[in-house]
């Protein structure tokens, strides 16, 4: 099995690539320095020389606040770059796996979002990821669009590791408690991507995230509890902590309970550190 992985040096890529090794897949792990997905001419010239079975498109502009500041760059990567990769997938007649986000929804629901629910992103990041989804659906039927939420894991900058570092030097922190989410371990998501590569899943859109729901304050407390860190967590409202990008109030996805609970996965992740 021959696979192109874009954004392989990112948070999810660093978890996924060793799993690809474990199943004996041949893969080309790329990053923006050697494979600029926004440069259609370069992408086509390179891909004309290779044969593939899958494209796993992880490359993205993921900094939600910076997307508001650098809107052109966010759309260039998440929209145009994804469009280019969809065209390559169509040209080579291979499936493309695209990682999208719960941010394509506005957060006004009170129950987990289904794949069939109407999208309505409220920030540039969500809008750009949705535009990527739309390009893929328009260009190729052979696609797996995976929406996920609030990733953490080894090998990259993420909230969980940031809190562990913070706890080494501080005794208290204020964290919002009116944003509901489903934080997801990159290992769990990577396993589901491997399952897709194994075959049998219909093309389409999937929600893959940890089961259950929490808020940022509760999630932070759990991190400190598991690692026995003495840090007081003060719940605050998101209105008390203004940021450049609007955040949905509710970002829980209906995943059919295919993954473990967020508590179980968080504990497994932290106990190995």
Say what each PLM segment does.
Residues 192, 199-244, 270:
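Mid/C-terminal beta-alpha module of Rossmann-like enzyme folds, strongest
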Residues 229-231, 246-273:
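C-terminal amphipathic/interface module of NAD(P)-dependent oxidoreductases
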């Amino acid at each position: 099995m021959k696979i192109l992985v874009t954004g392989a040096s990112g948070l999810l890529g660093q978890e996924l690539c060793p799993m690809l090794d474990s199943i004996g897949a041949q893969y080309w792990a790329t990053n923006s320095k050697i494979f600029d997905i926004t440069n259609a001419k370069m992408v086509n010239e390179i891909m004309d020389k290779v044969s593939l079975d899958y494209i796993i498109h992880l490359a993205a502009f993921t900094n939600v606040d910076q997307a508001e500041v650098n809107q052109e760059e966010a759309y260039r990567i998440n929209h145009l770059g994804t469009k280019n990769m969809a065209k390559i997938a169509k040209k080579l007649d291979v499936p493309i796996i695209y990682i999208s986000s719960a941010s394509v929804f506005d957060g006004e629901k009170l129950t987990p979002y289904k794949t069939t629910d109407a999208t309505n992103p409220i920030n540039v990041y969500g809008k750009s990821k949705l535009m990527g989804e739309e390009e893929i659906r328009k260009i190729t039927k052979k696609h797996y669009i995976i929406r996920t939420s609030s990733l953490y894991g080894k090998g990259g900058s993420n909230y969980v590791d940031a809190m562990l570092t913070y706890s080494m030097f501080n005794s208290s922190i204020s964290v919002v408690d009116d944003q509901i989410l489903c934080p997801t371990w990159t290992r769990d998501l990577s396993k589901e991507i491997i399952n897709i590569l194994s075959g049998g899943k219909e093309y389409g859109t999937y929600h893959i995230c940890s089961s259950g729901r929490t808020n940022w304050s509760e999630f932070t407390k759990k991190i400190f509890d598991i690692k026995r860190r003495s840090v007081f967590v003060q719940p605050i409202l998101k209105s008390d902590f203004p940021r450049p990008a609007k955040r949905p109030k509710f970002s829980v996805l209906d995943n059919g309970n295919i993954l473990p609970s967020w508590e179980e996965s968080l504990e497994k992740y932290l106990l190995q550190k």
